[in-house]
């Protein structure tokens, strides 16, 4: 009549879970540095409360003489019904994305999609059932989160524009001017060796300049539009800046590179 011994998982696999259950507790790893864990904890507690409520209601209907056999069947059925959410691989991998799709699990790939789940009828009904939030309280929080998200995206977009225009572009322009000057001197001296390489580098630097200037114009226009346009423009600008980083002299590049941030700073 006692519960069986359940071995405790001693591995570190849960490092890839957004809120990992590590033996006797949940660890929340998805919230950002400026966010509170209170929201995820409140939601998880409400979900657990509904699960326990549903289970208690079912168990209370069992007759004492058949309680244990029915309990075993109930536990087996519950595990079978919800086993699809268990994944013991790498949650960051493409394997899990494909596996989740095969299992019919939702995959919310951006903030806007995730925010809208707050006012889904199913979720509203859950919070109202247990007196956690009313519909209007959820709608007001959704509106606040939405407004805050738009504000942050515009701030990030404006900062991306300023960094590219005032830090990256001058460094790239200087590199282009130095390369063109070296090419001009080589041609004036009627040198044949090295001029083709200088010409090729100058062309690449010039293309990178044109690309970044064009992306800056696109981002500046997007900043007056919706968040989707800003995100697309920021992504394109980032691609152009990453390409420019490979062309500029390491000593002239004004920002830390990935390898420096990972292994030096």
What residue spans do the PLM features occupy?
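Acidic, glycine-enriched catalytic cores built around paired aspartates
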Residues: 1-265
């Amino acid at each position: 009549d006692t519960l069986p011994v359940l071995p405790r998982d001693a591995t570190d696999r849960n490092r890839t879970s957004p809120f990992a259950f590590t033996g006797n507790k949940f660890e929340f790893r998805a919230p950002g540095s400026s966010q509170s864990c209170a929201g995820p904890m409140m939601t998880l507690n409400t979900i657990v409360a509904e699960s326990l409520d549903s289970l208690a209601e079912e168990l209370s209907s069992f007759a004492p003489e058949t309680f244990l056999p029915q309990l075993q069947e109930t536990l087996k059925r519950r595990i079978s019904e919800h086993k699809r959410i268990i994944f013991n691989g790498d949650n960051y991998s493409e394997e899990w994305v494909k596996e989740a799709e095969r299992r019919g699990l939702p995959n919310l790939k951006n903030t806007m999609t995730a925010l809208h789940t707050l006012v889904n009828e199913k979720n509203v009904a859950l919070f109202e059932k247990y007196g956690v939030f009313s519909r209007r309280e959820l709608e007001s929080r959704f509106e606040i989160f939405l407004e805050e998200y738009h504000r942050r995206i515009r701030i990030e977009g404006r900062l991306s524009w300023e960094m590219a225009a005032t830090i990256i572009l001058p460094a790239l322009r200087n590199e282009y001017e130095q390369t063109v000057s070296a090419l001009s001197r080589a041609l004036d001296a009627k040198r044949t060796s090295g001029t083709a390489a200088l010409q090729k580098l100058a062309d690449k630097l010039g293309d990178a300049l044109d690309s970044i200037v064009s992306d800056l114009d696109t981002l500046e226009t997007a900043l007056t539009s919706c968040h989707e346009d800003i995100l697309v423009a920021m992504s394109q600008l980032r691609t152009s800046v990453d390409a420019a980083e490979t062309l500029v002299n390491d000593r002239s590049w004004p920002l830390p590179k990935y390898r420096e941030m990972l292994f030096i700073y």
